[in-house]
Amino acid sequence: MTKRALLSVSDKQGLTDFAKGLVALDYELISTGGTKKALEAADIPVIGIEEVTGFPEMLDGRVKTLHPKVHAGLLARRDLPAHMAQLKAAGIQPIDMVVVNLYPFKATIQQPDVTQAEAIEQIDIGGPSMLRSAAKNFAAVLPIVDPADYEQILADLQTDAVTPALRQRLAAKVFQHTAAYDALIAQYLTTEEFPEKLTLTYDKKQALRYGENSHQKAAFYENALPTHFSITGAKQIHGKELSYNNIKDADAALRMVSEYQQPAVVAMKHMNPCGVGLGTTIEAAWDKAYEADSISIFGGIIALNRPVDLATAEKMHALFLEIIIAPSFDDDAFAILAKKKNLRLMTVDFEQTHTADKFETISVGGGLLRQEVDAAFETPADFTVVTVTQPTPAQLKALAFGQQVVKHVKSNAVVVTTADRTLGIGSGQMNRIDSTKIAIGKAMKQAGYENAILASDAFFPMDDCVEYAAQHGIRAIVQPGGSIRDKDSIAMADRYGIAMVTTGVRHFRH
């Protein structure tokens, strides 16, 4: 019996060559709409779907293939005589292959100003139905959804090398594809922030050599609706491929540097900033970030919110760095940095910061945690002075900078800063006093310590942190407040005559 293949594709890539190969193998081709016209234009013999169903297309093409003569031909089990007898009695011929890719819903909703009505018209109904029918019956029907598979499938057909394993792989690919397609539609139509069913779909962006450690396998996936301002939306223009750890650190650095309005540089190591600097120029900001911790910056990830110029590039070129990510690189800056073949240079559109993710999701055993991104930002207008001593205008500026930095540091987090650079960062300690000692210990070695302030990501459970800070020259502190022992910390600050402000906003980061 002549084999039959049903072709209905929105992506015509490779279609005619594949169809010619099928005809050469004595396949009878069935097709619909634009696919049929494309085949006819290439002088490839094809019959219309209405000749199979005996029913014309209707509702502006919304109903074409939703017919028993199509789906019975796909779903009938060839190994069950009763199924084949029913086909014969109904005058239905089996269909042995389905070649379908779906309406371009994703491309449609990514167009600017697309209306919901336009998007809905690109929700494919018949295509997924045919693919799922074929994939369910993959033992007898080849379900093909990806033009990239045409060449290999044709070669296997020509050599009679279509294996059960290949059939199962193609079926799995179909169900992955249709599940992702439906998830994208659900994602588009859902207005709830935390729906009862969370349907997200991701596409494999790249394979990674390994994960966090060399014995761990890993890959990098991108949201099917990626944001322009993100590490996935960044463009790598030089250097070796990104690693798992590179991606995490670059993401953290990019999120942080995007919060600053004036020229800023963030140096990131192991998901913690090791140096942050602000300046009137990007070179000045670099100098401050570098001076903040010239040891830890070695092998770091650098994020800048201004184009990289030659002067800044020359200074960065003198160091071993993993990644530099910025809006752009001046030609002469790129030329000098590109001399390091392994240094990864990346660009991202800072005009698109408004598109950054509003939610973040992390995996836990057996599930996910989803929350709003911590976009809170406290300014001096949000501060409440709780001590007798009032902070000076200069201290208020420094407190605001410290508060903005500390929320990006792993808890327990304490930072010591001036108004435009970090001096010491204490991160990830199990108690706040240890973080305080680390931050102050680093800061005391820095120029400008006499103007330093201290910021804490959460309240002080006891007054020991305030006492230690005061004894080591800190003159102003910002912290959320809210401890049952706040009065003890405030009294300690008053005892030493230092200013303290509270924000009412905690910034834990795990």
Swiss-Prot record:
One of its GO terms (molecular function) is phosphoribosylaminoimidazolecarboxamide formyltransferase activity. GO terms for biological process: 'de novo' IMP biosynthetic process. Keywords: Hydrolase, Multifunctional enzyme, Purine biosynthesis, Transferase. Pathway: Purine metabolism; IMP biosynthesis via de novo pathway; 5-formamido-1-(5-phospho-D-ribosyl)imidazole-4-carboxamide from 5-amino-1-(5-phospho-D-ribosyl)imidazole-4-carboxamide (10-formyl THF route): step 1/1; Purine metabolism; IMP biosynthesis via de novo pathway; IMP from 5-formamido-1-(5-phospho-D-ribosyl)imidazole-4-carboxamide: step 1/1. Residues 1-145 form the MGS-like domain. Gene3D superfamilies: 3.40.140.20, Methylglyoxal synthase-like domain (3.40.50.1380). Its EC number is 2.1.2.3, 3.5.4.10. SMART domains: AICARFT_IMPCHas, MGS. Pfam families: AICARFT_IMPCHas (PF01808), MGS (PF02142). InterPro entries: AICAR_Tfase_dup_dom_sf (IPR024051), Cytidine_deaminase-like (IPR016193), MGS-like_dom (IPR011607), MGS-like_dom_sf (IPR036914), PurH-like (IPR002695). It catalyses: (6R)-10-formyltetrahydrofolate + 5-amino-1-(5-phospho-beta-D-ribosyl)imidazole-4-carboxamide = 5-formamido-1-(5-phospho-D-ribosyl)imidazole-4-carboxamide + (6S)-5,6,7,8-tetrahydrofolate; IMP + H2O = 5-formamido-1-(5-phospho-D-ribosyl)imidazole-4-carboxamide. HAMAP family: PurH (MF_00139). Belongs to the PurH family. The IMP cyclohydrolase activity resides in the N-terminal region. This is Bifunctional purine biosynthesis protein PurH. The gene is purH.
